[in-house]
Amino acid sequence: MSANAALAFGIVISLLGVVWFLECANQVAAFWATFSILFYVLIYTIWLKRTSVQNIVIGGLAGATPPVIGWATAAGDLSINTDSLKDFANSIFDLGSWMPWYLLLLIFLWTPPHFWALALYRSKEYDAVGIPMMPGVKGHSRTLLEMKIYAVLLVILALLAPAAMGDMDRHDTIYHVFGWTAVIVNIWYARTVFIIDPDESRTESGRIPTAARSFFVSMVYLALMFVIVVTASAGLQGAILGAVLAATMILRDEWNARKPSDDVSA
């Protein structure tokens, strides 16, 4: 496919997507879909991707909007009020719950340590195509410092998970089951960030084993966070189910991490 054909295809599916949200969902969902597309293309891809080491940090905002778009879609008949700037802001930000914004912030804070773990051992490939990633520009020490900061922020954010639900009382059992599950899942992921050793021997495929593990765990971590949010929304039994699933995945990963494994290229 030529560059022009790819551009045309991207424009067409973007327009179709926005129109679909406008006709089948509501104006607010269409607005955030439009915002996501324009921010990703103009701010991230055209401006930041090849000019700043903070490219994925700022650009990560576009990738963090799907929960907001989905929540607005599920909310039903939402419309944008343009009578004043205040009315406009209220109409696009007030989705009836803090949870979509909690999930947006979760993805936003997760993005840097997720991608930088990969970039720690793929920085030469990023450099070869002119993408300035943090490890290649600022070095491993600076990258690991910032990754650890984001990991700590994610643990702090986990403490707010029950409050983001909106209908959980801190005296209820579900509040503590869900809250502690979120905290433990975040500590588990944060630990994989803190134990990354850029000086350890690389595998035959060029991986830094601890960085590779953190990268792969980060994907399981994000999925688990969404799973426990969904299960907890179903009540105490759902929160317990989410806790059991999280514990199973964590124990499985810790068990596998202690076993010798064959090197598979990434």
Q: Over which residues does each language-model region extend?
A:
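Hydrophobic residues within alpha-helical transmembrane segments
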Residues: 1, 8, 12, 35, ...
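Cytosolic, membrane-interface loops and tails of multi-pass inner-membrane proteins
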Residues: 1, 116-144, 199-202, 264-266
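Multi-pass membrane catalytic core of lipid/isoprenoid biosynthesis enzymes
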Residues: 1-30, 140-167
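Intramembrane alpha-helical segments
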Residues: 3-78
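Helix-coil boundary and interhelical linker segments in multi-pass alpha-helical membrane proteins
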Residues: 16-31, 66-107, 159-177, 230-238
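Transmembrane alpha-helical segments that form the membrane-embedded catalytic/substrate-channel core
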Residues: 38-45, 104-123, 155, 183-198, ...
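Small-residue-rich transmembrane alpha-helices that serve as helix-helix interface/gating elements
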Residues: 179-186, 219, 237-251
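Interfacial loop-to-transmembrane junctions
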Residues: 190-227, 231, 261-266
